[in-house]
Amino acid sequence: MPLDARIRARPALSHRAEENRNMHHEADVVVVGAGIFGCAVAWALGNQGRSVILLEKSLKEPDRIVGELLQPGGVTALEKLGLRECLDDIDAIKVYGYDVIYYGEEVRIPYPENATDTVQEINEKQSHSDEYRGTKRKRPEGRSFHHGRFIQRLRQKAMSNPNVTTIEATATELVRCGFTGHVLGVEATRNGEQESYFGNVTIIADGYASKFRKESRTDTPVVKSKFWGLELIDADLPMPNHGHVLLGEGSPVLLYQIGTHETRALVDIPENTPTASVKAGGVKGHLKNVVLPSLPKQVQPSFQAAIDRDRLRSMPNSWLPPTTNKTPGLILLGDAMNMRHPLTGGGMTVAFNDAVLLSELLSPEIVPDLDDTKLVLQQMRKFHWRRKGLTSVINILAQALYSLFAADDYQLKALQLGCFRYFKLGGNCIDGPVGLLAGIIRQPFVLFYHFFSVALYAIWIYITSASLFGMPIRAITSIGVFWKACVVIFPYIFSELQS
């Protein structure tokens, strides 16, 4: 049965199940973290008749500078979950695509048309070559908003589910079977008291700074830069209802409206950036002396006002490849399990699609009893590989684009220019890449095709832009440009395959 049909026919559990959650702290599923993924998966499993305990250390509205742009692929997943209304009444802004500005030169990149068609419908309408390139026809929309407002709407929706009990408590450690190591639930602190919560499955979704990640994997997130955020008031954006990516000397700057009067500015600052050192005036000095002059003239007044008014806040830009959940009784998901650079705004799209897929694979029709650990682990292996059609694309694209957009050598600069000129070609040269970024096109080969199309186009520009006498030298050094392209993308491809 389709997920949305199961939502309409949601079975309510007995009063006894609710009593078990409230009095005995026992449920089919314990979810740790009422964030993007935690709320979505609690809602989805509750709609299937599962008894769910949702734990969150603080139910106050969060105040973060990321998680504010939902791509069209995420909006579609939200609709499948029956959570589309969470985008209402939060002053969310429609997003139609991107505006990329390269040293003052501008190109509009709208979301691709016909994004809601199925693969079968696309095959019927397109040639085989067009399908490989990812060409589509009917333009969808994303949404941008204040993160905290959206989270509170998700939490309200989860709390309204009769099969979900939401408790404000801080999970402190896993509860394991002393003989098998099977995870039985979590210990948590609530109102200063230690309590235990038990479930056949414990889902950990406690975010990028997860305290439980080490329970199922030994590697840690790789952080090479931070996003520093400002909130601009009544900013005059070059292209309203679009995300703006500003490229120039140094790392990229993002601008996107999150409310009627508010615009988020995110400035990427790599570690050990000299212009952001204490001697150079710190981060505020970098923003004033390096970033501000590079912005479009119309944005500069609101950016300057935000620097003078706001406290500076940052978030680490992390890379953490996915892993298969192999611990009996434990499922690690959300940012706790997989992260990519937030440049492409793909995190929430991944989370909502993971919630859809997980609820399908663990549905009562397939897994009648979540206490069947062997079957649950079998389904989690399927989950790991089935999610890659979308998540591997978003993961690899985010890391590869950041490498190009934060170019710091001549090879990457050549690829960066090639990427921008490729977008300027229009047509499929923008529909394919932005379809991948939007979570609409779920074909890794399309990513591979466009990335190396960019690389070859960049090499052609690199060679032909030289003088007649310089072309032979450029032809030789272009080998380094192609090699750099391989160095950029293949490590992330291998990490997806190995994981």
What are these regions (language model features)?
Residues M1-V29, A44-Q48:
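Extreme N-terminal leader/targeting segments of oxidoreductases
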Residues R6-P11, T275-H384:
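FAD/FMN-dependent oxidoreductases across multiple families
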Residues L54-L55, I204, L333:
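Generic enzyme active-site microenvironment
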Residues H24-E26, T76, L87, I93-E215, ...:
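Conserved N-terminal helical subregion
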Residues E173, G181, E187-K326:
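Conserved FAD-binding catalytic core of PHBH/FMO-like flavoproteins
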Residues R6-R8, E360-S499:
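C-terminal helical "tail/cap" subdomain of flavin- and related membrane-associated enzymes
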Residues G38-C39:
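N-terminal Rossmann-fold NAD(P) dinucleotide-binding loop
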Residues V32, G46-V66:
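Glycine-rich FAD pyrophosphate-binding loop
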